[in-house]
A protein has these predicted regions:
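Post-HExxH zinc-binding segment in Zn-dependent metallohydrolases
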Residues: 108-135
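Short alpha-helical catalytic segment bearing the HExxH-like zincin motif
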Residues: 85-94
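Active-site scaffold of zinc-dependent metalloenzymes
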Residues: 36, 40-84, 97-101
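Short C-terminal domain-edge/linker segments immediately following a structured domain
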Residues: 60-65, 105-109, 119
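Catalytic Zn2+-binding segment of zinc metalloproteases
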Residues: 94-111
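Short, solvent-exposed segments of well-ordered alpha helices
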Residues: 81, 85, 109-112
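Short, charged/polar N-terminal "headpieces" of proteins
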Residues: 1-54
Length: 135
């Protein structure tokens, strides 16, 4: 299957959206970058549903919203990652998103399946950074 890559686009306020398709797993992870104030309306728009709002968004360096039946998880970052710490936060949130994907696949994380997780983190991080640099 061909990789589908979307350039960052502005959606729902001041957020930039990046779609990362996970290849043969036919699973999409969304990353949005921008102010926390626009996040609730984005999630409700993307998933066409209400969700349990989190009050800790304003202090967070990044978050991963999971558990949606109709779409993949959403990684949120307050700004484009540039420092090692910010890129590390993206990788951290990517791990949460990939655990969701592996649950969806029915695959337990263990030594003989950890390559899916490790490769996936690299794929998400490199895709998000590449798409943000295109701006």
């Amino acid at each position: 299957m061909d990789k589908v890559r979307w350039a960052p686009k502005r959606v729902k306020g001041r957020l930039k959206e990046i779609r990362t398709h996970m290849g043969q797993f036919d699973f999409t992870i969304w990353t949005v970058v921008g102010p926390a104030a626009d996040l609730d309306s984005y999630i409700e728009w993307r998933h066409e549903c209400l969700y349990e709002k989190r009050s800790d968004k304003r202090q967070a360096m990044g978050l991963c919203f999971q558990g949606f039946e109709d779409h993949g998880p959403i990684i949120w970052l307050p700004k484009p990652p540039r420092t090692a710490e910010e890129i590390g936060t993206l990788a951290h949130e990517a791990c949460h998103a990939l655990v969701e994907m592996m649950d969806w696949m029915g695959t337990e994380i263990k030594r003989d399946t950890d390559e899916i997780l490790c490769h996936g983190v690299g794929h998400i991080v490199s895709n998000v950074l590449a798409e943000l640099r295109k701006r």
